[in-house]
Amino acid sequence: MYRALYRKWRPATFEDVVGQAGITTALKNQILHDKVGHAYIFTGTRGTGKTTCAKIFAKAVNCQSRNGADPCGQCPVCTGIDDGSVMDVVEIDAASNNGVDNIRDLRDETAYTPSVCTYKVYIIDEVHMLSTAAFNALLKIMEEPPSHVIFILATTEIHKVPATILSRCQRYDFTRIAPQDIEGRLLYVAGQEKIELTPDAAGLIARLADGAMRDALSILDTCAGVTNQVDADVVRRMAGD
């Protein structure tokens, strides 16, 4: 089955993450110096790497054969997190699991130690979608978190997250990725995929993506589905210009 480019080329290490050097450096230093916190909040526009960094971090703190601060990607824990068979790393979409009962179930789970990992990691995406009661339940866990639990909250709307939650998290602001960084990544991916992408086309896609790497790769995917020779005219045609 064909895998979309944004999924196939999702960064697997901190080194692969484009345009967020300050954040990846800080996270790597915490791992290397064993100063991992119990709660983080990643905020920024869509497609800037929040969930990707959360997953890399979750693997890195639990990896059995870590390469510096990066996960090896090959050990049973890394592969198990990738394929969903390791239950100690849980990704929750708050948009569809936003009730107090969902968070109470999570709270009950945190009482148990990890089965195969060092840490249980809960990645709560679009956390701003939680109900007021759910936020209150989450706060109760975060006030006295078990030592084996890490929360990584991700949001595109930080202003909707209660101050009581924010004050208990390390905050990292993901910025829109610079067009030149997106352009470079597009040209690299195109080369690996044997797609003939012109620099002008890469630059145009980078501008259309408005700082979101995921969107840029999706546009490239759409264009390459029409022709393997992607120039600026192809991009304009597919973008409806």
Language model feature labels by segment:
Residues 1-171:
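P-loop/Walker A NTP-binding region and its immediately flanking N-terminal helices
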